[in-house]
Structures are given as structure tokens and as C-alpha cells.
Amino acid sequence: MENWGLAEWLHWQETLNPKEIDLSLNRIRNVASRLEILPPENLTFLIGGTNGKGTTLALIEDILIQKGLKVGGYTSPHLNNYNERICVNKKPVDDSRLIESFKLVESVRKDIPLTYFEFGTLAAFITLNDLNCEAWLIEVGLGGRLDATNIISPSISIITNIALDHQEWLGSTLEEIAKEKAGIISAKIPCIFGDPSLPKNIEQTALEKGSDLYVLGRDFSLSGYWGRLVWQGKDAAINSIRIPSHWAEGEIDDLCLALMAIEIVDSELLPTTKELNHLLNNFSVSGRFEIIEKKQTWILDVAHNPHAAENLRKRLESLDPYKKITAILSLMQDKDIIGFVKVLDDLVAHWIVCEMDTPRSHSVQTLQKKLIDYGISNVTSASGLLEAFSNVKNHTKKNDRILITGSFEIVGPAKKWLDSE
């Protein structure tokens, strides 16, 4: 163990707990109590919700870095390298730094069977602590109430939105899911919610915990016309905001959330109009409507539920509407295949389904049968991801548009493959 590399550590962590997901805070709190983890008192952001967490986090990250702060971020899952999960000023930490944190967790863990995610979460907190990050941006993994990230005391809790996803863990209705997501609301700590449709369980939890609750559309908003938008927060406003042309409502909501969170924790950190427009002009998040221009135009998006597919559709519609799309799709077994596909189908000329390199992936046979049974005839299959990518490359023309979507587990390999081409 002393001489293990990162890959060996990660493989071993997968064997510690027989369950891949084992929602409970008892184990991680027990181990955390033996470590010195001290998040910044005024700049610790805990970001939950169904969709938009990564984009909201990235916007806050860019704004705080622009203001000269040392910003630590913890996100999951990763696209290709585990190190992507733990970044300081957007730069992934190196293997040796991660391994030192793993060793420290293991030295105090004793016989407590931490899950892979719990072990990594503790290592992330140790790393951000040891590197003296002035702000912590923490993305919730699954749900909220029992998620490993929920052991920290945030300065603000952010819930982006509530949609159907992970129903086997979080509940089958929006209110049940909202109750789990609301678990990140801390007593007397402000919370912001990024959807005008406020679930009763979020409102009730905030009330019970004495937390000030700020709701998009009620307490803060972005309004006006394109190129001259105005963000209005609690007491502050930013005028003449230029939103990127390919953004849809989801990204606009994420920006509203990011700005509101910053105003609440420290309004002095809000950007000027010039600073914000410069930031937005250069803003991107890997795997979120990421456009890679080769011979063809490749669009990579990690959307994996119907709510995310709706936003993806709006972004696709912002492009040339006369160009039909070839879509490469794979989804995990717990995802709603038809709910996802029917949102995008009329934009797609040809579907190619394939299986990801994980036992949680839907089989290619299941994906193809579901699409055909739904009435989609323009669907073919590939035996694996690389076959799907290369077949599409070889059978499409210059400037054709190719969408790869459905999971981090297909977008990551696609990005790696495209980088090597």
C-alpha cells in the first residue's frame, strides 16, 4: 500500500464496501471526526439538485478566481481522469497529492467500510484543506440528505432544480426527491433554489431549520432582452449582460443561482458587467454542450434524464435548424430511455446505440429494442463505443453534426477518442 499508484488506490477503494451506493452519514462522520477538516467559514458552497450542478459550480468558480481567490472544487463523476474531481483554480490536483490524502484517510479509517465515494470525499476535503483553498465549491453526489458531502457545514446551500432521476434511491415523485435534496439545507444557513416551482418539502425544510430561502423568479431573476439582460438579486443588480448565443434556460438559471449565491455570502465579490461579460464570452464546462470541430461537428453532452434532454434540445435548436443530427446514445440501466429519446427524436436523423464499459449500462439490445418499439426505425447498433465513434466518423460527411450523449461514461471516452484523432 505504501508504494501504490493512484490506480491501485482507486481499485482497492472499490472493494472496501460491498455496496457501490450505501447512503448513510454514520460511517463518513465517524472517520471525519478523526481528521482536521476546516472548510472556509464564509465561502463554502454546497451545491445539490438534479441538473445544472456542474455548470453552477463552474460559474461560481470562474467568478471567484477572477476576483483573485484560491478556489477548491470537488465534483463527480469525472469524464476521464479521477483527478478531475478535485481541482484548485480549475487545475486537477496531481496523483501524489491525492495519494497523500488517501493515506491519511486510511490511517484513521480502522475497520469502517467506507464506500468509494465516501473515501474520495474525505480525501477531497483533506486536499482542499491542506492546500489552503479560500473558497470550497462542493457538488453533492446523489440526493443530499444522506450524501457524503453533507457532513460539512456550508456557508450557503444551493439546490438547482428538482426532476425525476435516481428514483430507486430518492423516491418516485418530485416531492419525495425534493425531500432528499432538501437535506443539504443547514440550520440558520441561507439556501437558494433555482426554479420558480418551489416544492413544498424544500419550503418546509427551510422553515423548520430557520434558513432564509431565496427562490428564482421570486427573490432574484434575469430579465430583459438578449444582449441587454439585467440580473436582479437581493440588493444588487448587474446590467447589460450578454448571454452566449447557444445557452438555453438551464444555463441562464444556473447563472442566476451563481450570482445570487455570491451576493449572499459576500456581495463585494460580485463581478462588474465588464468582468461578467468577459467571463461568459470564454465560459465552457467540459462535457456540457461541448462542441469539438473536426471534419464533422461533434457535440458532447452528459445529459442523462428527460429534464436535461429538454435543455439539450433547446441548445441544439440554437444551432442551424436545417442540419439534422446523427446521435450516438448510451444510458445507464436506471435511466428512462424513451423519456430521454422522445425529447430529441425529431431533431435526429439517425440513432446509433451502444453499450458503455460498465455493468450498469443498458445493453445495446435493450436500447435498440426500446427505440424500435417506440416507433423509431432509423436506429442501428454498435458493439462498443469505439466502433460507434469510428463508424460515424467514416459514414458522415464534412460539417455533419454528431451528438454524443446519455452519460459521463460515453462522453468521457468520446472526448478522449476525439483528442487522439
What does each of the following model-derived ranges do?
Residues 192, 196-201, 208-213, 225, ...:
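C-terminal helical cap/extension that packs against the catalytic core
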Residues 5, 19, 25, 29-40, ...:
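ATP-dependent carboxylate-amine ligase catalytic core
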Residues 144-146, 153-211, 337:
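Conserved catalytic-core segment of NTP-binding enzymes
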Residues 407:
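Active-site-proximal loop/hinge segments that shape catalytic or ion-binding/gating pockets
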Residues 77, 192-195, 207-224, 245-249, ...:
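Beta-strand->loop->alpha-helix junctions that form or flank phosphate-binding loops
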